[in-house]
Structure formats: structure tokens, C-alpha cells
Amino acid sequence: MNKKVVILGGGTGTSTLVRGLKQFPVDISVVVSVCDDGKSTGKLREEFDIPAVGDLRKVIASLSDTEPLFESLLEYRFNTNSDLNGHAVGNLLLAALCNITGNMSDGIKSLSKVLNLKGKVLPLTEDNVVLMGLMQDGSTVEGEHNITESKKRIKDIYYKKNPVINPEVIEDIKQADMIILSMGSLYTSIACDLISKDVTDAIDASKGKILYVCNMFTQPGETDDFTVSDHVQVLNSYLGKRKIESLIINDGKIPKKFINKYHREEDKDPVVIDKSNLNNMNLKIIKDDFVTLDLGSLKHDAIKLSLKIFEEIIN
């Protein structure tokens, strides 16, 4: 029987992870935060009163086992002067299926059959949630997009109204052999999955190991100047009684030209590995060179990363 893995996250980082992990003999459930409110997703949320679909779409595309053309179709964005401008086909498809089936979870299950998904994709909630940010300067910012765009340091996040958590999320977490906090936006993709007590209670009740894959670069508006231990401390502050047990970090050399490029164009810098702080955190630290180049962007090597995770799962 395959080991059960629950991944909490969303967006590009989680998509990279599942693209590799689906190649291994594990049962994957991906819990996706649904508080994104920018671009196409924001328009659809406002018009149809549905959970955010953008991160769900990315993870579904990465888990699919079908013709590459279908994955390209899900990710295709219209560039037109009409009302379709900026919308991704996958976002429209999920919005339509949500209306047809009556909820997002059933809509995703219908699409999963068509795309032969190598795992489950679970929205954290069916509610049209609004993420709130309490900033270090005492101000409050409403909405995920506004939180990151405010360029203020985040002190805390919470939901404007506490959502009803998807029961399948709770059940899968309790049965998991490993719970992975994915690389990705620290507050708006991962921590926002942990701010519900129902989720942290389920993690506390689970016997699954808690593993965190740290980002390679900081993210403007969320983790400026953060070290690896800063990332861990933030996530541990949102977890319940149980904390992160294993940590995967990249110690591969990042080419100088990419460090300069990311700093200049995106205001991102490599996350510093602060060994002295990490050594005092009671963590199993797994280091390797995970750097790879994909279409001109630096990413974690999905297969190499997944192999390390699989070794942890079976040990």
C-alpha cells in the first residue's frame, strides 16, 4: 500500500513539487489555499462568489497525466480586448464546473477524471474567503493581493470571517504518513492553510511527519530579508502543538548572474542559511543542490527534490 502524503500550499512552488512527486509510488493530496484575489481569479471570485481558482488550476495542471496540449490549454490566457482578456482557460473551466456540480470540490473531481490526475486536489474551503493582514506598523490590509502589494512587513494574517474547512482536508491530514509544507508564498500560500484551528488540530492528531521545503529566494512584500530560520519560525507560530520536524534546503550554488537578475528585476534575494539558528531548532536538516534552470527561471529540481522527500517518507 502506498504511503499517504498531504501537501499544503499552492501556486508555482507547489506545482513544481507535485510535478516531481507524482512520479513516485505515493498517494498525494494537495490542500490548496483559496484566498488569491488578483487578476483573472479576482474577477471570477467577484462575479461568481466562488473560491479562488488560480492556484487550484496550477496544481491540477501539474498533477495531470494526459497530453501536454491539455496542460497548455489549462494554462492558456486570452490576450484580447474583450471581457475574456487575462482569463486563463483553466480558471473559466473550474468556475463553470463549480456552477454545474454545485461546489468547487465536486467540480475538481469531475475535471480530475478527464485529466487523469495522479493525486487529489482539495480546496481548503468552499467559502469565498478574504485574507486579512495585520502589518508591523499596526495597519490592517484586506485581500491577498493588497497584502503583498503593500510592501509592508507582515505581523500576522487571519480570515475576515472564519471559513468552514473542507472535511476531506481534515480526514486526509489525519491519515497522512507525511505532511509537507511546500515552497511558495510563505504567508499567502502556506501559512493561510494553517490559520484554521481545525487544520492544526488535524495535524496534531496525525502521526505523519511534518516536513518543510524552504524557498530559494525571498519574496517581496512577504519575506524581505528573511533567513531560513525566519521561514521556519513563522510556520511554527501558526502550527499547533506539533512543529516542523524535517527541513529541506538548497545549498547548491546559485549563479551570480541570476542573483543579480532576480534582485534587479523582481527585488528577490537568495534566502540565507543561518546555520547557528537552525542548529538550535531541533530539526532534521536535509541539504542538497536542487538548483535547475527551467525556461530561463531558477527552480527546484522537481525529481531530485521529490527523491529526497520519498526517501524521508519510506524511512
Language-model segment annotations:
Residues 25-26, 206-210, 244, 283:
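A short helix->loop->beta-strand "cap" motif at the edges of active sites that frequently abuts
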Residues 193-200, 226-231:
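Charged helix-capping and loop-helix junction motifs
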Residues 35-151, 308-311:
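Electropositive, gly/pro-rich neighborhoods at or near active sites that engage anionic ligands
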Residues 13-18, 183, 188-195:
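Short glycine/serine/threonine-rich phosphate/pyrophosphate-binding segments
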Residues 1-5:
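Extreme N-terminal starter segment of soluble prokaryotic enzymes
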Residues 228-315:
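C-terminal functional extensions of proteins
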